[in-house]
């Protein structure tokens, strides 16, 4: 698709706005159906018919902080939302197998690659940290789970603190208490004498991909699942602990904010890029709050999974 440059309702083929696009260009039909937010700058509209735009990227613009914002057609968004629902159910269905893998290999006396994979998977399923590709570390010093170094691990008698700067220069901090099952394996893996050495020094991107492949999911699926899982846990906790309860709308907004703080991005990104919309629609129901208040978290999670599964099957 050709990128066209937008200014004051007009389209141009150049970013100096010297060469206007003809009035019969199909992109003008697209503009009749969408509203480009006035606060966006450097807007690019993609040349396509309205029918094509329904399933594609329509336009991109920069917000006040210089971040590029992407706007897609309705059917693209619907397909993306349905995909998130399927990912949530798929990961939930393999979590027992993942935990079995962790339990089997984390008991090893050596710190071989399988042991490191077990610790890696345990950390990922606890904190849902971004993967951390080596190229991002080299390009902009962005750290993820795979690129954690010993210097990012602070050990004390009662807890271990994991501190690093991730994507978009967001600072992350995770606390592992001595009572947590991750404490001893992480302590065993950390080498204070080599601060610049990678924590997972026997792993590579390929080894992690091969490991996760056996479960029929992708590593990024764990983060999508994790955001929704964290949202559900926070939502369940809020229903149990807040009195009087705010409206469902305010309760959802509060829970999304809490979830975003845990996983390290803004509430809007949490909702737009990770949340399964079927889950959001489900928890909007006032009557559903009564169900939540009478269940354990595992029961609540099972109810949600069954509902999402029935929606995807339908």
UniProtKB/Swiss-Prot annotation:
Transmembrane segments: none annotated. Induction: Expressed in the late phase of the viral replicative cycle. The active site is at 274 (o-(3'-phospho-dna)-tyrosine intermediate). Changing residue 274 to F: Complete loss of activity. CDD domains: Topo_IB_C. One of its GO terms (cellular component) is virion component. GO terms for molecular function: DNA binding; DNA topoisomerase type I (single strand cut, ATP-independent) activity. It is found in: Virion. The record marks 168 as: Involved in religation. Its EC number is 5.6.2.1. It catalyses: ATP-independent breakage of single-stranded DNA, followed by passage and rejoining. GO terms for biological process: DNA topological change. InterPro entries: DNA_brk_join_enz, DNA_topo_I_N_sf, TopoI, TopoI_cat_a-hlx-sub_euk, TopoI_cat_euk, TopoI_N_vir, TopoIB_AS. Keywords: DNA-binding, Isomerase, Late protein, Topoisomerase, Virion. Changing residue 225 to R/S: Reduced activity. Changing residue 220 to I/N: Reduced activity. Residues 77-314 form the Topo IB-type catalytic domain. It comes from the Viruses. Releases the supercoiling and torsional tension of DNA introduced during the DNA replication and transcription by transiently cleaving and rejoining one strand of the DNA duplex. Introduces a single-strand break via transesterification at the specific target site 5'-[CT]CCTTp site in duplex DNA. The scissile phosphodiester is attacked by the catalytic tyrosine of the enzyme, resulting in the formation of a DNA-(3'-phosphotyrosyl)-enzyme intermediate and the expulsion of a 5'-OH DNA strand. The free DNA strand then undergoes passage around the unbroken strand thus removing DNA supercoils. Belongs to the type IB topoisomerase family. This is DNA topoisomerase 1B. The gene is OPG111.
């Amino acid at each position: 698709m050709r990128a066209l440059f937008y200014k004051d309702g007009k389209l141009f083929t150049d970013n100096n706005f010297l060469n206007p696009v003809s009035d019969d260009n199909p992109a003008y039909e697209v503009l009749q159906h969408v509203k480009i937010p006035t606060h966006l700058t450097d807007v690019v509209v993609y040349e396509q018919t309205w029918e094509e735009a329904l399933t594609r990227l329509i336009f991109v613009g920069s917000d006040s902080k210089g971040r590029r914002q992407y706007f897609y057609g309705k059917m693209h968004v619907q397909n993306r939302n349905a995909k998130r629902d399927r990912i949530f159910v798929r990961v939930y269905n393999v979590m027992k197998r993942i935990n079995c893998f962790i339990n089997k290999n984390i008991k090893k006396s050596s710190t071989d690659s399988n042991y490191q994979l077990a610790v890696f998977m345990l950390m990922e399923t606890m904190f849902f940290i971004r993967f951390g590709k080596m190229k991002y570390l080299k390009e902009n010093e962005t750290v993820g789970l795979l690129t954690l170094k010993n210097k990012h691990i602070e050990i004390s008698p009662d807890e271990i603190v994991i501190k690093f700067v991730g994507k978009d220069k967001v600072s992350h901090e995770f606390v592992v208490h001595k009572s947590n099952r991750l404490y001893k394996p992480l302590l065993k893996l950390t080498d204070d004498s080599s601060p610049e050495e990678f924590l997972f020094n026997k792993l590579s991107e390929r080894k992690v991909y091969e490991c996760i492949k056996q479960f029929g999911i992708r590593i990024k699926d764990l983060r999508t699942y994790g955001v929704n899982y964290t949202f559900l846990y926070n939502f369940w906790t809020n229903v149990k602990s807040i009195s009087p309860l705010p409206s469902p709308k305010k309760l959802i907004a509060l829970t999304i904010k809490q979830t975003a703080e845990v996983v390290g991005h803004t509430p809007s990104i949490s909702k737009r890029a990770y949340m399964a919309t079927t889950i959001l629609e489900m928890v909007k129901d006032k009557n559903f709050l009564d169900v939540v208040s009478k269940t354990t978290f595992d029961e609540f999670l099972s109810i949600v999974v069954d509902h999402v599964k029935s929606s995807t099957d339908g």
